[in-house]
Amino acid sequence: MRNGLKLTYTLLEGTYVVHELRFPEDPAGETENAPSPSRGLHPSESPDGRNILQVDGKWVEIFKDDIISVSAAPTFHSVPCVGYVVNEAPVQGKVDPKLYIPHLKRTGTDMRLMREIQKGQTVTLADGTILEGPPREPGRRIVILGDTHDPSPIEELAKEADLIVHEATNAHLPGVDNRVKMEDTYESVEERTKSRGHSTPQMAGRFAKRIGAKNLFLNHFSSRYSGGDDESSRAIMEAIRQLAVAEFGGGGVVCAKDLMNIEIPPKRSLEEGKEPTVIEGTR
């Protein structure tokens, strides 16, 4: 970005900031939070950018606020590439009112106390009964991979993802795609795809299963697969999806399209009929 703006003598009305994920093999000389004069900034570039160094092969929590945190790790491709993990902060557990209200009614307690219980607080009733609000629950996790034929470096960060976005560049589709070469097999297509730094749907499905993902979104399809709405294109994309399903097993598999939206429901540990933690007092 910096060089592109400099070479084209472009000036911007506002400023921008660049935080760079540094690989161990990157040229030496720039360390984390290097002084701005040593970095040849563009006039529109903020000096607040950071060089973020790897720790144990990963970039952990390169961004964090009260809602989400973002971590990253390299993925194997023909050139340096990165995958990202977006973690939602723990959220307050859901209250099932019917499990608490009887205790409040029995002791003549103001129902407004439910607000405190919903916040996860512990309250003591008039007879000494202690009601504990629901604990905070893990937030959602989304994994977004770039080009890759092996994303194993991100596996630890990606465990139990609610959704993983994984490329599926090429596929062997006999009987569906009339451009299939007679000599090709599932194995030969996978080896050729890997040699170019990419993945097949089966590879995506296997990795999603390995990390315990709940949903798999396939993307980065070869341009030979148009993804159109005609019957032939739909059949091809469904065949690609089924190849991933066969390896992934349980969970949802979707062939992504541009501008597609997906809502990931919040995690809820509350089981139907499960009693809250109630400690009877001695009063």
Whereabouts are the PLM-identified features?
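A short, acidic, amphipathic alpha-helical segment used as a generic capping/interface helix at domain edges
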Residues: 150-151, 196-210
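Active-site-proximal loop/helix segments of hydrolase catalytic cores
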Residues: 142-170, 176
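A short helix->loop->beta-strand "cap" motif at the edges of active sites that frequently abuts
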Residues: 211-216, 249-251
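Short, flexible, mixed-charge acidic loops at enzyme active sites
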Residues: 174-186
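Binuclear metal-dependent hydrolase catalytic cores
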Residues: 1-144, 151-156, 224-283
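Helical hairpin unit composed of two closely spaced alpha helices linked by a short loop
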Residues: 172, 187-199
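Active-site metal-binding loops of divalent metal-dependent hydrolases
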Residues: 75, 146-148, 168-170, 204, ...
